[in-house]
């Protein structure tokens, strides 16, 4: 008597198998039945520790996913996968990449991130069809001395972030098709001049390094839209920045800038400019030429004045200059008719210009202790000038002493939890990186609708998130081991847990 065999057991022509999140400890034996036809194999997020010899008989594979396993070795037999186009072995325990990887000539997308690698194979440039390479978070200390990036001429995305790289080879300028370059979280003190050859580069992230200067040749990045150079040691920005006509996002927060070049006003496509935590005394007059600028953040600088040209930023919607030394806001600010949020808390303002009443503000922050985004103002006269002015219960501004418990920081300043808050009113104010802006509907809308509030916080870059998590974990360990903090350990840990959860 004949029994019907399930159709799937008869079918020897299977091109794709997806076994992700299946708690696999071993590679399933049945996979090898389809060695002649299998082109896509996804074994991500399992508990695989090794790849058996038989595994490398799947020579038809074009896409192989092995991320988030416990694989401890990538055998030299990887060379058998000569038709492989995509390889993802990220977040495993692989200590080295075999030199035989160079035989995978068809490889276009390779992700080795999150492994305990300390070096790349010398043969890596032989992968001449690579378009996307991720080797971030692998403790890489240097690139091969003889690496010739010109052989990887098709490379479009290169992620070297969160390693220990001190120098970049000059040959990086040969990656003429490169669109995205991540170098964040390394030990770079300079960038090679040749980086200016990357005419097609759209995004450059060199945040969290040790850069003291940028090369003038950066002006050659004529396609650049995103430039992130946060958390470095920069004191100046080259005038060549003005030649980046397509630049939309510029983040230079947490550096040592004392001034911005006038050339920044030539970045005609700029929509977001982040200058937080520098040493700026003023902003360039040319900033008024940035007609597309919608978000300008210069919190925690040393600004003593604002140029009247700031009113020329006709698209500006959010303007933050919290914790500076401003004594007045220029009346021309009212010309920025799209402005909805103005944060001037923590300054030395005596009053506000009457012209601000022309703006349709949804939030005007004058103090950390302000309970509502909008206040009731009265008109008065400035007896020194005779001009009409605005005043309220929070003007003139008085120094405040924020506490760590009241204002838990945005992870970038978690060290405040173990340092005493300074008592000096203006000069050495405790760093508070909570830039929270609450939006509410206009008073007219409140009459018709329920009152609603939205808490807006600056969205961290993905690289910053990883740094934030490490900072929180290290701080927790240090504080728990410190003497004299036992009494408030629970309170601090509870605070850190809240921050960790938000990350």
Regions of interest found by a model, annotated:
Residues 1-285, 292-295, 305, 363, ...:
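The feature captures the LRR N-terminal capping module
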Residues 300, 308-409:
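Ankyrin-repeat TPLH-centered helix-turn motif and closely related helix/turn capping elements
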């Amino acid at each position: 008597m004949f029994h019907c065999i399930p159709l799937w057991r008869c079918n020897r022509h299977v091109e794709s198998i997806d076994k992700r999140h299946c708690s696999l400890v071993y590679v399933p034996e049945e996979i090898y039945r389809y060695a002649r036809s299998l082109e896509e194999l996804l074994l991500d997020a399992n508990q695989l520790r090794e790849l058996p010899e038989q595994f490398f008989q799947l020579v038809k594979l074009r896409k192989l996913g092995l991320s988030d396993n416990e694989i401890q070795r990538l055998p030299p037999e990887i060379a058998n996968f000569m038709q492989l186009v995509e390889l993802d072995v990220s977040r495993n325990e692989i200590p080295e990449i075999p030199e035989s990887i160079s035989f995978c000539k068809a490889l276009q997308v390779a992700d080795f991130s999150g492994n305990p690698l300390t070096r790349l194979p010398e043969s890596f440039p032989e992968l001449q069809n690579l378009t996307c390479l991720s080797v971030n978070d692998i403790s890489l200390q240097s690139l091969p001395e003889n690496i010739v990036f010109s052989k990887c001429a098709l490379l479009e995305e290169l992620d070297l972030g969160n390693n220990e790289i001190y120098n970049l080879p000059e040959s990086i300028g040969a990656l003429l098709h490169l669109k995205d370059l991540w170098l964040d979280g390394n030990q770079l003190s300079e960038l090679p001049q040749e980086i200016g050859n990357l005419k097609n580069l759209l995004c450059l992230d060199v945040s969290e390094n040790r850069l003291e200067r940028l090369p003038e040749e950066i002006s050659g990045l004529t396609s650049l839209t995103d430039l992130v150079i946060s958390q470095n040691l920069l004191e100046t920005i080259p005038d060549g920045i003005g030649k980046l006509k397509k630049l939309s996002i510029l983040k230079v927060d947490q550096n040592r800038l004392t001034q911005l070049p006038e050339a920044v006003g030539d970045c005609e496509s700029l929509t977001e400019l982040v200058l937080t935590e520098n040493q700026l005394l003023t902003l360039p007059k040319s900033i008024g030429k940035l007609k597309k600028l919608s978000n300008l953040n210069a919190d925690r600088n040393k600004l003593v004045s604002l140029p009247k040209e700031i009113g020329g930023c006709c698209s500006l919607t959010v303007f933050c200059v919290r914790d500076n030394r401003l004594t007045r806001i220029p009346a021309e600010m009212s010309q920025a008719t799209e402005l909805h949020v103005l944060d001037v808390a923590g300054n030395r303002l005596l009053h506000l210009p009457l012209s601000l009443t022309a703006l349709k503000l949804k939030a005007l922050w004058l103090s950390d202790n302000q309970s509502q985004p909008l206040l009731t103002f009265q008109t008065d006269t400035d007896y020194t000038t005779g001009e009409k002015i605005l005043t309220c219960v929070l003007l003139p501004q008085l120094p405040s002493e924020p506490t760590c418990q009241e204002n838990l920081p945005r992870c970038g300043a978690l060290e405040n939890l173990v340092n005493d808050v300074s008592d000096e009113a203006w000069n050495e104010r405790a760093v508070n990186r909570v830039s929270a802006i609450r939006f509410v509907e206009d008073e007219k809308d409140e009459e018709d609708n329920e009152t609603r509030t939205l808490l807006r916080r600056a969205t961290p870059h993905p690289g910053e998130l990883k740094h934030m998590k490490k900072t929180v974990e290290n701080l927790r360990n240090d504080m728990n081991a410190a003497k004299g903090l036992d009494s408030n350990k629970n309170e601090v840990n509870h605070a850190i847990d809240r921050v960790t959860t938000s990350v």
